[in-house]
Amino acid sequence: MSLRRRAPVRLLPFAAAIATVAACSGRADDDAALALAASFQQALKAELMAAMAAGGPVNAVKVCSERAPAIAAEASKDGYSVRRIGTRVRNLANTPSTADQQALAELAAKPDARFVRGNGDDVVLARRYVPLRIEAACLNCHGKTDGMQSELQQALATRYPDDKATGYALGDLRGAIVVETRH
């Protein structure tokens, strides 16, 4: 079955999360933001694992670079936006701002935190930062480079010439999913 045919089913978690967030008056409450972040993470993880099963870690690189932004865009509706930021940048589009860096430092200092709140600005009413921690499968592309397949190293170097997102260990803070409520 093609991804195109499964797309409506794959987006159901987003619809449920958005409905939950929309039911909150004024600003997104913490549980709703966590639900939206979890839906995004589940959808991305499902595509990554399918890509890994179909063609190994080299195949997964394309999912992170091309599909992850699209999945985030699909989740960003009705005044809410979802994006990823990294503690070490691979994709320059995921470079954390100064406010993002402060939230990442707070998440690093609180390893058991489910999320941290960030301040808004002229465009964003509120931010929730949900930690992304390194899992075993993540180590294929984000672990030590001396253990990576040469084809994977080449794929990463081609797609991300300034890659800094390696050298992580299991459980490390990789970054965060940022859920923003817009004015």
Question: What is each PLM-predicted segment?
Answer:
Residues 2-14:
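Bacterial N-terminal signal peptides that target proteins for export
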Residues 21-23:
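C-terminal motif of bacterial Sec signal peptides marking the signal peptidase cleavage site
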Residues 27-137, 146-183:
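Extracytoplasmic c-type cytochrome modules immediately beyond a signal peptide or single-pass transmembrane anchor
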Residues 140:
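Short, cysteine/histidine-rich loop/knuckle motifs that typically chelate Zn2+
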Residues 143:
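Short Cys/His-rich local motifs and their 1-3 flanking residues in nucleic-acid-associated proteins
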